Amino acid sequence: WDAGLYETIEFASIGDYVWLDSDKDGIQDAGETGINGIEVKLFNGAGTELGSMLTTNNPVGGADGWYSFTNLPAGAYYVIFDKGIYDFSPQNIGANDLIDSDANPTTGATALTTLTGGENDMSWDAGLYEINLPASIGDYVWFDADQDGVQDAGETGLNGIEVTLYNIFGV
């Protein structure tokens, strides 16, 4: 009689959340919600990209900003978050690794971590905050001699005209 033997491979997984860090402190606070549509790329320890996904709703509970790479053999991995229109919160703030931001603020990469077979490491997350860029508005004021609303050749600019900017509430 022959016995067929096989090795059971236990796969690992890595993931967590990308959230809107409204106070920019690098800590997931109560009320700070996840962000869907952020690209997360998975790399092995040699720096080879293994896959990517967009953050989405968690299938358990439905919270926004969830990602997970599953069915990974034991080994070294890291992820890189694409900040999109946001900026990264400070990295590794506080003592609780489950609620801090793990993304390097410059590169978006996490540290390299080694997963063992069967490990489910859901602690690799990123805090993002909205960028408030300074804005400007302006153009040119001219004497519209023919009153057609179009600046024609020969219609000269006017100095000393006061321009007032209002918000949507008229203030």
Residue locations for each model-derived region?
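Acidic Ser/Thr-enriched surface turn/capping motif at secondary-structure junctions
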Residues: 1-171
